[in-house]
């Protein structure tokens, strides 16, 4: 806005500064002087429709348009628009944009109607635009078919330019309508064409001379130059006969001028910090890669790293460091950020550094397993199902009941959420989050048909269903554990050893295990056979059938003396080493043992034998599902625990990603499938895995538990997986019923985030 003595003037697309803002459209009082000015006073009206001496003087100097000139100008513009609309060649004449024409003080330049005024240097304004438009029209004429219309083009040379004139609002609206119908404006025609995302990562040509870059912050296009670069480049224009116009814009080969990061929300770091990492990425690209647009490539890669960080500074810094390292070592692929996603599905294996970090986390967790309730060494009690467990306390309402007569005790009223301490003045005492009632106020907010219980003592758990130790000898032959009695006898944990399972001396597999251990002790230590990577070989426990079966046939039925004599045979050492290591994991061509990582999550329900396994889910390090089945419990089902297990029917199959139905399996079949996936060297990842291992009745010491990895400030309680996923992954989980696949993937991603920084 601009205020003067005559009133208020407003710069807008629909009002020229030379016109009064509040003058009437018909000019009824244009020739009458203002009464206030005539009386010698100052006009205080902001919408005075009368004439003022200042405006009359200005119009006399600039020249006012008569009614005849206005009518003639309207007629000329209308004829030009009619010629353009009736041109059968598709409208070769170009009209400027309506908004641009209204913003200009002078008459807009319309080809075929008028020309632009001359500048101070004598050169016609817009002459360069006319030359560019004429060259474009000549190229289109060459591509036209012989059947094209021969209507002559209406063009006026720059020498016949008309004096500057005004354009009424009605004419501007007509120009705007015609522009929407296909008449392109010169501002749109001469817009800067930004290079596409594919062109950014093309190698630079030595023949092209360096050109000056464009500042992306001063771009006149609706989108910024960086956003235009991120999207796919526009397809070349097509003529009417279908031929593609491949003429590139003069500015399509220009790089960004400044290294300025793109603003995003939430921002993971400050602008100076992002600029520092952006310069490091650009320096790496300049030193190791010869790209056509190194600055634009650096800006896009830094923006991708900032988006992946989800506002976390530690994740952002690690993403940038990994990106710079991948560019320097040559593993980076332009436009795909392959170096920053080494632990995702885009990568086929994990580097040795990540494998070493996982081993270090597992070794730190191992001393803390016993105090966190993991089954380390339960006493080897006699296996078999008890006839009477006795009096137990309900796991929900804490009432005592007789397990065989549970149906006679009536319903169970309970609170499904744990009691919490009030953190404000409105709730200072303990309360239940499920109903916001203080502790002791009511019996419960939900009701179940019967009471349930859960065994906590490991000896009692081993008495109901025996534990099995995950070891090398367990995966030699899964067919030997078909019956419950045989598997229980051969897999009961020993009190003398916490690493391997205790087997009777009469077991045939014992001689083979002892012979392999003796052969292992005789061979010298070889550093080349140490684990180098994980998940870069075949599937876990994928072994050669001929060698394994032949070895088992030799081991079964032989005594210890026969096994010792067989060790001193002339069999090659390489073959015996391959046979010894094959069952415990996958081996590469060099014979080195591969360490695997499996994320596990189990769901449990209440039965007459306590809490049993009802669903097991296993995924690999890349998030691929390897096992997801519903397990039929051994005891009688008392409660499905649907709120936390997500199971409402034990016979309902699980639909896999391929569309196949996974029917429910028995507990013995679940054991067999689990032992195919894990071995002694496998690292199990999960949250609160002590409950999962107890439900699976497995003893394992290579564990990465996120509840131990991220302890809460209160030692009495552990941090929930939902809290960890929201804090480190910006992911909301467990909004409804628990999903074992969702929980396993969240725990695995939390561990990956911990490895990154």
Curated annotation (Swiss-Prot):
<dbReference type="GO" id="GO:0005634">
    <property type="term" value="C:nucleus"/>
</dbReference>
<feature type="compositionally biased region" description="Polar residues">
    <location>
        <begin position="202"/>
        <end position="223"/>
    </location>
</feature>
<keyword id="KW-0963">Cytoplasm</keyword>
<keyword id="KW-0269">Exonuclease</keyword>
<comment type="function">
    <text>3' to 5' exoribonuclease required for proper 3' end maturation of MRP RNA and of the U5L snRNA.</text>
</comment>
<dbReference type="InterPro" id="IPR013520">
    <property type="entry name" value="Exonuclease_RNaseT/DNA_pol3"/>
</dbReference>
<keyword id="KW-0539">Nucleus</keyword>
<feature type="compositionally biased region" description="Polar residues">
    <location>
        <begin position="503"/>
        <end position="516"/>
    </location>
</feature>
<dbReference type="InterPro" id="IPR036397">
    <property type="entry name" value="RNaseH_sf"/>
</dbReference>
<feature type="compositionally biased region" description="Low complexity">
    <location>
        <begin position="244"/>
        <end position="253"/>
    </location>
</feature>
<feature type="compositionally biased region" description="Low complexity">
    <location>
        <begin position="474"/>
        <end position="502"/>
    </location>
</feature>
<dbReference type="GO" id="GO:0003676">
    <property type="term" value="F:nucleic acid binding"/>
</dbReference>
<feature type="region of interest" description="Disordered">
    <location>
        <begin position="56"/>
        <end position="259"/>
    </location>
</feature>
<comment type="similarity">
    <text>Belongs to the REXO1/REXO3 family.</text>
</comment>
<keyword id="KW-0540">Nuclease</keyword>
<dbReference type="Pfam" id="PF00929">
    <property type="entry name" value="RNase_T"/>
</dbReference>
<feature type="compositionally biased region" description="Polar residues">
    <location>
        <begin position="230"/>
        <end position="240"/>
    </location>
</feature>
<feature type="compositionally biased region" description="Basic and acidic residues">
    <location>
        <begin position="565"/>
        <end position="581"/>
    </location>
</feature>
<protein>
    <recommendedName>
        <fullName>RNA exonuclease 3</fullName>
        <ecNumber>3.1.-.-</ecNumber>
    </recommendedName>
</protein>
<dbReference type="GO" id="GO:0005737">
    <property type="term" value="C:cytoplasm"/>
</dbReference>
<dbReference type="InterPro" id="IPR034922">
    <property type="entry name" value="REX1-like_exo"/>
</dbReference>
<feature type="domain" description="Exonuclease">
    <location>
        <begin position="597"/>
        <end position="751"/>
    </location>
</feature>
<feature type="compositionally biased region" description="Basic and acidic residues">
    <location>
        <begin position="120"/>
        <end position="132"/>
    </location>
</feature>
<keyword id="KW-0378">Hydrolase</keyword>
<feature type="compositionally biased region" description="Polar residues">
    <location>
        <begin position="145"/>
        <end position="172"/>
    </location>
</feature>
<dbReference type="GO" id="GO:0004527">
    <property type="term" value="F:exonuclease activity"/>
</dbReference>
<dbReference type="InterPro" id="IPR012337">
    <property type="entry name" value="RNaseH-like_sf"/>
</dbReference>
<feature type="compositionally biased region" description="Basic and acidic residues">
    <location>
        <begin position="543"/>
        <end position="557"/>
    </location>
</feature>
<dbReference type="InterPro" id="IPR047021">
    <property type="entry name" value="REXO1/3/4-like"/>
</dbReference>
<dbReference type="GO" id="GO:0031125">
    <property type="term" value="P:rRNA 3'-end processing"/>
</dbReference>
<keyword id="KW-0698">rRNA processing</keyword>
<feature type="region of interest" description="Disordered">
    <location>
        <begin position="474"/>
        <end position="590"/>
    </location>
</feature>
